[in-house]
Amino acid sequence: MIDSIQNIFVQVSDFLWSYIIIAVLICCAVFFTWRTRFVQFRLIREMVRLLLHPDKVQPDEIGQDELSMDVKVDGEMKHISSFQAFVVALASRIGTGNLAGVATAISVGGPGAVFWMWMLALLGSASAFIESTLAQLYKRKGKTSFYGGPAYYMKYGLGKGWMGILFAVLMIITFGFAYNSVQSNTICLAWQKAFGIDPATMGIVLTLLTLLIIFGGIQRVAKFSSTVVPVMAIIYLLIAVGVVIWNITCLPQVLLTIVENAFGFNQAAGGVLGVTVIQGIKRGLFSNEAGEGSAPNAAAAATVSHPVKQGLIQALGVFTDTLVVCSCSAFIILVSGVDVTASNGIQLTQDALTHEIGSIGNPFVAVMIWLFAFSSIIGNYYYGETNVRYIKDSKLGVFIYRLAVAAMVMIGAVVSLDFAWSFADITMALLTLCNLVAIVLLSRQAVFLLQDYRQQKKEGKNPVFSKDKMPEIADQLEAW
């Protein structure tokens, strides 16, 4: 029965990605890039400045300039800094997609898939800017913090409550269940290969740790993410840079191979090019989530003086994820010279690193994937919880959701790799399609906000937004 379900998943996934999602993703990314006049390139210095040098004002100001999320713990207001707000989103982006996803893309689509991952990041970061700016615009005031996301701009921006509920359900299924099953599956495969640990045993450990973290609340999520993500990213980047430097003479040929394969110059069969493009964009979206509607859930929780500030921050996250971390995985695999068709997923990354640094490569990747994937499980959980609260803000609903997430972590540990990925591909496609429709319809508002931000910067001001600037929708902008 499992095989039959898996076959259905594969067929549905192939149809969605071959005939619908790829075209829609690319068209929307190009459209947003044009409408914003290449915001992801023009304002990259501003993105870095906002992250590293947030403006300081009084914490009781709604329009304060420090990018932060406010959380009440034990009766006291706690601040989650701009850096923590950034890494909560980055924790979800940086995960299995960076190690196993890249390897799968290369194994199935060839080295050229890496090129299409880069293209999705370069153009798709404009989509990330639009969706996160809109999430900020339509965010709501909670008792102790702001909250929001695509479900909210669908309801209050488009006036379509049903669409918001549909998106919320898809978000819960995709991130709370499907993505977390992939993360769990990859961790267990890596640890089985490195240490011989049974996946079921590892699944139990993962499930218990997940319950411990998610019942601690967003403050614990932010603390965990802000500690783990930078450490794991730096270590992995250092190893990758070391591997590339050690094989520096191979790098020009690797880059040439990526470009040649991206356009089918060396392909033996005409259909291979299509597979290359699909794999690159599919795994690129799984990794950086640009336009998918996930990062806006974290972006909406930030307290900023202008919605564009958080839009720029999240666009930077797409660059960081794909152009830096994913590229590191790709270079490790391609400079190693291992047969990319001999293995798949995380095991290909393990084989490549073992080839470069010796037998320590296997356990190193296993530990690294634990950190990457487990931080993603926590980030994914938070996105799902936001949407559970959108449908019905009840303690019982959240409690049931937490148990369901833990159950999917356990299930993901024991199902096949193909089953986990196929399930995720379908829900990811539907979620992305729903979100892209909404942000295309609302893109005019995000462009207006960008123009307002740029104008204030030209006047030497620290940009501040007020809903009086958009009187036609002012009654829907609760937080401004």
Q: What do the PLM-derived regions correspond to, one by one?
A:
Residues 32, 120-144, 150-151, 155-185, ...:
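Helix-loop-helix module between adjacent transmembrane segments
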Residues 1-89, 96, 107-112, 441-480:
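N-terminal alpha-helical transmembrane segments of multi-pass membrane transport
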Residues 22-27, 164-172, 193-218, 235, ...:
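Transmembrane alpha-helical segments of multi-pass small-molecule transport proteins
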Residues 129-139, 143, 239-257, 265, ...:
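Extracellular/periplasmic helix-exit of transmembrane alpha-helices
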Residues 4-5, 35-40, 97-102, 176-187, ...:
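Transmembrane helix-loop junctions in multi-pass membrane proteins
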Residues 24-31, 36-48, 185-191, 198-247, ...:
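Membrane-interface loop-to-helix entry segments
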Residues 61-106, 134-137, 143-151, 155, ...:
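Alpha-helical membrane segments and immediately flanking helix-loop junctions
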Residues 13-53, 105-144, 320-326, 362, ...:
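Extracellular loop-to-transmembrane helix junctions
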